[in-house]
Regions:
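Short, structured "edge-of-domain" segments at secondary-structure transitions
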Residues: 1-232
Length: 232
């Protein structure tokens, strides 16, 4: 735990103005890549969808994946399927959820992307996540979860599929919210409040999907870590 880590410069030489923003595993079976997509999200709320197959061959010096404005940068890259939803979260506590299948697929790598979320003053995107889509409205799902005498089979199905969005703030506060509370909308909207960014809480540091039985490890910018159960 006390190790300072190893440099990745031997794997990917970076220029002085560049930094690593995302690391993701790929399916070992490359025949699956044609069915998958890569989602890019930027600090200023832009989003882009490419076929994973577009990046099947990358030279050792890397490949330009997306054009960016001078004041923008990539904050996250993630693999998704057509039947999944995308969630963008901002540092001032806003979240927006929309369908992956409604994003057009970009063929080249020269585009700056399209608007994923409309940001308020001084707000920036800090997290990109993927969730499995559900075929039930949030209102019906929440009603079934609250009503113990409801259709037991349907209620059990909803509980089994339920995930949570865990939002953590810079001052160490967290909030766990059912993903049924995040209704699916069109991309480019203002989103809803996922967690309040107040003087007590601070701005949002991270927001990501979890299961109730998961454990998470939280790390500070000084290298301290803590491990705790999501249900706590």
């Amino acid at each position: 735990p006390s190790s300072k880590g190893k440099t990745l410069f031997n794997l990917l030489p970076l220029k002085s103005h560049q930094s690593i923003s995302s690391i993701m595993p790929l399916p070992e079976n490359e025949s699956e890549w044609k069915k998958l997509y890569v989602i890019f999200a930027t600090l200023n709320g832009k989003i882009r969808k490419n076929s994973l197959d577009d990046f099947a061959n990358i030279q050792s010096t890397g490949k330009i994946a997306m054009k960016l404005d001078e004041d923008d940068k990539i904050i996250g890259v993630i693999i998704c399927r057509e039947d999944q939803d995308i969630i963008l979260s901002t540092r001032l506590g806003k979240c927006i959820r929309f369908m992956s299948k409604k994003l057009r697929i970009f063929k080249g790598r020269s585009s700056k992307g399209i608007k994923g979320i409309e940001l308020g003053t001084n707000d920036k995107v800090i997290s990109l996540s993927v969730l499995d889509a559900v075929d039930i409205s949030p209102k019906i799902a929440k009603d079934l979860l609250k009503n113990g005498s409801a259709d037991k089979a349907k209620r059990s199905e909803i509980i089994a599929k339920q995930k949570y969005i865990l939002s953590l703030t810079e001052n160490g506060f967290g909030k766990r919210t059912s993903f049924y509370d995040y209704r699916v909308t069109n991309r480019g909207g203002k989103g809803i409040i996922g967690i309040v960014a107040s003087s007590r809480n601070g701005n949002v540091a991270a927001s990501f999907p979890v299961n109730e039985g998961d454990e998470v490890i939280l790390s500070t910018d000084k290298g301290k870590v803590i491990r705790c159960a999501v249900k706590e």
